[in-house]
Amino acid sequence: MISTTETIQLLKNSLPVQGRILAIDWGTKCVGLAMSDETRLVASPLSTYLRQNVQKDLTYLSKQIQEWQICSVIFGLPIHMSGDMSGLALQVVGFSKKLEPIIYPIPIYFYDERWTTQAVERQMIAADLSRKRRAQIVDKLAACYLLQGILDAL
């Protein structure tokens, strides 16, 4: 696993000059999506997708990538505090390997997403959102939080 600083440097060196970036917050039940504007200043929540099966998940994501003319995909990688890969992180990597040939030549990157969901949860609680509403939007907001952090670092 490369460091956050190294990932940002890799993105700076390899991303096309312009174009939308899609961030994916992969969960066991839901997938949160967020995308940047074409100039990469602002991240916006896109959708929360209820996972079904690998084939349907691949189809959904590839359609989103095509529809929004995405130039790069970044998966949040849920790794342990020790830096070791979690079981979910291994699932993310495995799924990305299936997505890669479908969306080629669009590159896929990974970014350490430790604490993103918790940070978003705290913000939603502070905003006094109900538990039900938080559950509906947490995944896409976590993806947005992740992506905005990346955009700010670029």
Residue locations for each model-derived region?
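Phosphate- and other anionic-substrate recognition elements at nucleic-acid/protein interfaces
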Residues: 1-22, 29-154
